[in-house]
Amino acid sequence: MPAPTALLRKSDEPLSAEEPSLTFSSDAQASGQGEAPSPIPTESAQHSDMRIDEESRPVFTPITDAGTVLRVETRKVPVPPHRMTPLKANWPKIYPPLVEHLKLQVRMNIKNRAVELRTSKFTTDTGALQKGEDFVKAFTLGFDVDDAIALLRLDDLYIRSFEIRDVKASLNGEHLSRAIGRIAGKDGKTKFAIENASRTRVVLQGTKVTILGRFRDLGIAQEAIVSLILGSPPGKVYGNLRKVASRMKERF
């Protein structure tokens, strides 16, 4: 009976050949088991900063802000021709607050008659570019550097501009000149009285009136100027300003 046993031995050979496939699958499972726990340390690392408070609530450490500008932004402020000479004369006073305080890059483009502002890698305030634009724009509207720089220090200051003819469209010629003179007063006394009573700054450029101050103070100054344009006596306007100033002192 050698033949049956020989057949049985031959049948055992393919089984032995299949053994490496079994070991390969077991190795694959082992390698898969070795790779599966790899993300576990990362998850634990993410929660490493977590702690539990007294009420069993998770408390995470706040994410720190990098404080860097992600992209470069630019602004261009046009300068009127009659303000180019004052801009050149006061340039040593204008650019230091923009560069040192707001960390902006600034240059005066004489050819295009504009002041160009740009953020840098040192800019940390997201509103620095807007503040710088407001500061330069206030100077181009006629305000002094010392008055315009208040826009960088205070956040509740606004600029309001309007034309004298917007108040009374029938003003022409001498009537328009007379209205401008009523706003300014003799030696600028009326304008100074409005500024001191309303805590604002007023600029007269031709037929345009520009006011710088807080929102509530802008309304007080504009109401006084509109009354003068419409023909109210200066004495009556002074009296109303005194009443408003006394009320403001009582509040504060």
From Swiss-Prot:
Residues 1-57 are annotated as: Disordered. GO terms for cellular component: cytoplasm; nucleolus; nucleus. One of its GO terms (biological process) is endonucleolytic cleavage in ITS1 to separate SSU-rRNA from 5.8S rRNA and LSU-rRNA from tricistronic rRNA transcript (SSU-rRNA, 5.8S rRNA, LSU-rRNA). Residues 22-32 have a biased composition (Polar residues). It is found in: Cytoplasm; Nucleus, Nucleolus. Component of the small ribosomal subunit, ribosomal RNA processing complex (SSU RRP complex). This is Pre-rRNA-processing protein pno1. It comes from Aspergillus fumigatus (strain ATCC MYA-4609 / CBS 101355 / FGSC A1100 / Af293) (Neosartorya fumigata).
